[in-house]
């Protein structure tokens, strides 16, 4: 079974959030009055594995495990192993803040994890504390170093924020020049009730222009391996690359191939939409089997919207959707 929407996009990528908990409090991810999902509402690992099994049967070939911070959930390493053992054919990726996992890197390598996306918005310790509310920069840098030493490919994701990390672009480029990483900037997307979005927005085009004033950035031709949303640039004389992801200024809705399932079992077909489809109650109803889940997933996929239409309708002080990013799963 192949998942296809009403405008002909094939969906083959699932982002599965295993928790909304995180050991950081990033300014763009949660607000002071943020409330966690109650524990009984969080999917059990066996329920998540059932969803992965279903996804694989529906031609999902790429799976990304996210949070919150996925490694903050007890038993996550065992869950990774179960997924890898059950579906060695799936391209498994993990997104993490990198603060908890330096000691786990050898085991991650052993069980077959070959790549990680690590969130890092700044290389400055004081700015890190300002952005995340915690003092863990050295832990993240140690994790990146350990991954590279172990042969795990690393993509570093930084949310581009004017007035926060725009002054560090040259430092980030140097970081990528010195290390074999993809250093990717993602345009800031206001979520939930964020009202500071316009003042923080730093466009991908502005980043590229600023970066080219510092170093020669050479466009990387798109290939089957490089078919994601990032525009990639090699750095002259460098080991790594610079990437730009522009969901706001230059959307990639026409080629979007992904679904999201939150840690409480809500299926979301578009990051810019608040429409959800409940899977948890079906999972926990003994009278409903996998066919009921397939039906919901297939019908939701058919109605997958073109998100930029929704983005165009928002006012400058509104988030792209009403839900906090930590609840959706970045």
Curated annotation (Swiss-Prot):
Residues 6-219 form the Radical SAM core domain. Keywords: 4Fe-4S, GTP-binding, Iron, Iron-sulfur, Lyase, Metal-binding, Molybdenum cofactor biosynthesis, Nucleotide-binding, S-adenosyl-L-methionine. [4Fe-4S] cluster 2 binds at residues 253, 256, 270. GTP binds at residues 15, 64, 95, 155, 258-260. It catalyses: GTP + AH2 + S-adenosyl-L-methionine = (8S)-3',8-cyclo-7,8-dihydroguanosine 5'-triphosphate + 5'-deoxyadenosine + L-methionine + A + H(+). GO terms for molecular function: 4 iron, 4 sulfur cluster binding; cyclic pyranopterin monophosphate synthase activity; GTP 3',8'-cyclase activity; GTP binding; metal ion binding; S-adenosyl-L-methionine binding. GO terms for biological process: Mo-molybdopterin cofactor biosynthetic process. S-adenosyl-L-methionine binds at residues 28, 68, 119, 189. It holds the Pfam family Fer4_12. The keyword Chaperone does not apply. PROSITE patterns: MOAA_NIFB_PQQE, RADICAL_SAM. Pathway: Cofactor biosynthesis; molybdopterin biosynthesis. The keyword Iron applies. Gene3D superfamilies: Aldolase class I. Its EC number is 4.1.99.22. Binds 2 [4Fe-4S] clusters. Binds 1 [4Fe-4S] cluster coordinated with 3 cysteines and an exchangeable S-adenosyl-L-methionine and 1 [4Fe-4S] cluster coordinated with 3 cysteines and the GTP-derived substrate. Catalyzes the cyclization of GTP to (8S)-3',8-cyclo-7,8-dihydroguanosine 5'-triphosphate. Belongs to the radical SAM superfamily. MoaA family. PANTHER family: MOLYBDENUM COFACTOR BIOSYNTHESIS PROTEIN 1, MOLYBDOPTERIN COFACTOR SYNTHESIS PROTEIN A. Monomer and homodimer. This is GTP 3',8-cyclase.
């Amino acid at each position: 079974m192949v998942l296809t929407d009403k405008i002909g996009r094939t969906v083959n990528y699932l982002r599965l959030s295993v928790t909304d908990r995180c050991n950081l409090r990033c300014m763009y991810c949660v607000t002071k009055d943020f409330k966690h999902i109650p524990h009984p509402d969080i999917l059990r690992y066996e329920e998540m594995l059932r969803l992965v099994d279903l996804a694989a049967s529906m031609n999902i070939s790429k799976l990304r495990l996210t949070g919150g911070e996925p490694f903050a959930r007890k038993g996550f390493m065992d869950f990774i192993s179960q997924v890898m053992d059950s579906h060695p054919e799936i391209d498994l990726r993990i997104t993490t803040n990198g603060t908890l996992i330096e000691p786990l890197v050898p085991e991650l390598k052993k069980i077959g994890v070959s790549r990680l996306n690590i969130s890092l918005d700044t290389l400055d310790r004081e700015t890190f504390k300002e952005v995340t509310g915690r003092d863990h920069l050295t832990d993240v840098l140690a994790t990146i170093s350990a991954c590279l030493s172990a042969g795990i490919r690393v993509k570093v994701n930084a949310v581009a924020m004017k007035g926060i990390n725009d002054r560090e672009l040259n430092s980030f480029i140097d970081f990528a020049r010195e290390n074999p990483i993809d250093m990717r900037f993602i345009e800031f997307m206001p979520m939930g009730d964020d009202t500071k979005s316009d003042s923080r927005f730093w466009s991908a085009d502005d980043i590229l222009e600023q970066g080219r004033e510092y170093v020669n950035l050479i466009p990387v031709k798109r290939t089957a391996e490089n078919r994601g949303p990032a525009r990639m640039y090699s750095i002259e004389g460098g080991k790594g690359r610079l990437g730009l992801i522009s969901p706001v200024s230059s959307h990639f809705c026409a080629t979007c191939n992904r679904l999201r399932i939150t840690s409480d079992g809500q299926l979301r077909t578009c990051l810019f939409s608040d429409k959800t489809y409940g899977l948890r109650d079906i999972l926990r109803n003994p009278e409903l089997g996998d066919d009921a889940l397939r039906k919901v997933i297939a019908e939701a996929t058919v109605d997958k919207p073109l998100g930029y239409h929704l983005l165009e309708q928002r006012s400058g002080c509104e988030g792209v959707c009403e839900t906090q990013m930590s609840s959706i799963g970045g």
